[in-house]
Amino acid sequence: MSHTPAPASPEAGHGPASSTSEGHLTVGDVVALVEAAAPPGLAASWDSNGLICGDPAEPVRSILLAVDPVAAVVDEAIDAGVDMVITHHPLYLRGTEHVAATDPKGRTVHRLIRAGIALLNAHTSLDAAHGGVADALAERVGLVSTVPLEPDP
């Protein structure tokens, strides 16, 4: 699913995002917007969230949204010519010692960088965020009184 970001506008609690000289949001702007909606501090201690690759100063004209950062998603992103991929699940759950192109995850990073595509993920931070994945699912199935399994950190 590809999406062209709308121009940034100030929202409650958020200042205006910066933009490139062409008026596009930057990778850094998109990261800031996602992190404002799903603060990294809400992520589980075992989880990985954030910008995996990409230059925060680069413009973003289109974004591909996906659940997992797998090869088929990278193929679609490259074919569609998007500037950024945002996934729910992380590429790496733990720190990595290498990103060799001989490793499937390393190959993913290499392909994205060569294509000039940034990769951002928001996993448990988005699950736990107010109005996030858990809240949306609860609402969809008709739950009216919900509490988190684990309290917010």
For each feature predicted by the language model, list its residue ranges.
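Hydrophobic structural segments
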Residues: 1-153
